[in-house]
């Protein structure tokens, strides 16, 4: 199966299925000498792992990562970094009833037509279980970016119809929703409790921000930084839309409002989301991603079987009623992977470029 590797100089390849024995990743291109420990990776994996609250799937996976190669005496060697996470809580029997059926809004139907067969257990390769390896790889990228003063972090900005105002980063790690507003957490909890009683699911919006990114990252035309970010973020399971900066709100803006004017003291706004002409401007890079409602719900849905006969499908098993609740670390990981890849590409081509024009921040 192609399409399992992302990046050009900093590359991430993942493999593994939801109910297989393990998930694996190969991270290649990480510069040598970076101090790296299991704790660096486990910290983000624990933020993503299932079963951490009543609002997520109750599948219990420790998601304990093993580093198989590429690290010696606590430092990266420059060789490929092999990573492994063992699956320990599969319940494949939950899916035996749907092995010949197609769940609505899942990848069952499309995988069947593409490959002629599919791993029906928990969605197989199409499951968001795969994103655990992205988070592990992204933790490596985040660690390297941090040595250059670049910080990547995210938060939930909307849960279903509830918009979440940004108040403080301090709140994000203090609740199960990654909400930046501590005051609205009870409302989010009540909404999810009712959703569970209704046996339904809901979507979410995640915002991810990179600060400290220098100007100059990104390539013209096809490898624009915003295009690469959209590619990476859209590759996350359940993501149906990506915005950079003001995004679709730009449609209603006038040019006098949308343009980010420059002054000697800094930019006056950041509607561009930190990217101009596909190249980073030095402002914070801001992206938003929309995740659809979970398709695995117990309410019967109309579908067909492999013979084309009409059936009603009820999805059993353990599922997230809102995949967006655990998506923040995944979005951070993908943004970090993109930024490190482009940082290394920029360094390879333009390391000798010197510009006397000052780097502007945002007022």
Curated annotation (Swiss-Prot):
Keywords associated with the record: Amino-acid biosynthesis, Aromatic amino acid biosynthesis, FAD, Flavoprotein, FMN, Lyase, NADP
One BP annotation, GO: amino acid biosynthetic process
GO molecular function ontology, one term from the record: chorismate synthase activity
Pfam families linked: Chorismate_synt
Span of the signal peptide: none
Keyword match Flavoprotein: yes
GO cellular component, one term: cytosol
Pathway this chain belongs to: Metabolic intermediate biosynthesis; chorismate biosynthesis; chorismate from D-erythrose 4-phosphate and phosphoenolpyruvate: step 7/7
Amino-acid positions noted as binding NADP(+) in the UniProt annotation, renumbered to this chain: 48, 54
Cofactor: FMNH2
Enzyme Commission number(s): 4.2.3.5
Catalytic activity: 5-O-(1-carboxyvinyl)-3-phosphoshikimate = chorismate + phosphate
Recorded coiled-coil stretches: none
Keyword Ubl conjugation part of the UniProt annotation: no
Residues reported to bind FMN: 125-127, 237-238, 277, 292-296, 318
Cofactor binding note: Reduced FMN (FMNH(2)).
CDD domains: Chorismate_synthase
Recorded family membership: Belongs to the chorismate synthase family.
Subunit structure: Homotetramer.
Functional description taken from the UniProt entry: This reaction introduces a second double bond into the aromatic ring system.
Name of the protein this chain belongs to: Chorismate synthase
Organism the protein comes from: Stutzerimonas stutzeri (strain A1501) (Pseudomonas stutzeri)
């Amino acid at each position: 199966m192609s399409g399992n590797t992302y990046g050009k100089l900093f590359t991430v390849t993942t493999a593994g299925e939801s109910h297989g024995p393990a998930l694996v990743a190969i991270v290649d291109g990480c510069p040598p000498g970076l101090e790296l420990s299991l704790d660096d990776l486990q910290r983000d994996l624990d933020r993503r792992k299932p079963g951490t609250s009543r609002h997520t799937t109750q599948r219990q996976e420790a998601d304990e990562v093993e580093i198989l190669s590429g690290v010696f005496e606590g430092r990266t060697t420059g060789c490929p970094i092999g990573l492994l996470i063992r699956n320990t809580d599969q319940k494949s029997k939950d899916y035996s009833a749907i092995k010949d059926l197609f769940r609505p809004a899942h990848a069952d139907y499309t995988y069947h037509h593409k490959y002629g067969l599919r791993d029906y257990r928990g969605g197989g390769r199409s499951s968001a279980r795969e994103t655990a390896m992205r988070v592990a790889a992204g933790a490596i990228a985040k660690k390297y970016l941090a040595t250059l003063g670049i910080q990547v972090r995210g938060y939930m900005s909307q849960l279903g119809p509830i918009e979440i105002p940004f108040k403080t980063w301090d709140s994000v790690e203090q609740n199960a929703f990654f909400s930046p507003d501590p005051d609205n957490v009870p409302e989010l909890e009540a909404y999810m409790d009712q959703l569970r009683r209704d046996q339904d699911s809901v979507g979410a919006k995640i915002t991810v921000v990179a600060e400290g990114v220098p100007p100059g990252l990104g390539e013209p035309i096809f490898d624009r930084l915003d295009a690469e970010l959209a590619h990476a973020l859209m590759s996350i399971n359940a993501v149906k839309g990506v915005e950079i900066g003001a995004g679709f709100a730009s449609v209603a803006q006038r040019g006098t409002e949308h343009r980010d004017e420059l002054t000697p003291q800094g930019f006056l706004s950041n509607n561009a989301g930190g990217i101009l002409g596909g190249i980073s401007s030095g402002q914070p890079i801001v992206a938003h991603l929309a995740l659809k409602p979970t398709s695995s719900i117990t309410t019967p849905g109309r579908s067909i079987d492999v013979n084309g006969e009409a059936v009603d499908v009820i999805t059993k098993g353990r599922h997230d009623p809102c995949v967006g609740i655990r998506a923040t670390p995944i979005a951070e990981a993908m943004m970090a992977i993109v930024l490190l890849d482009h940082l290394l590409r920029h360094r390879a081509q333009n390391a000798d470029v010197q510009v006397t024009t000052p780097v502007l921040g945002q007022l």
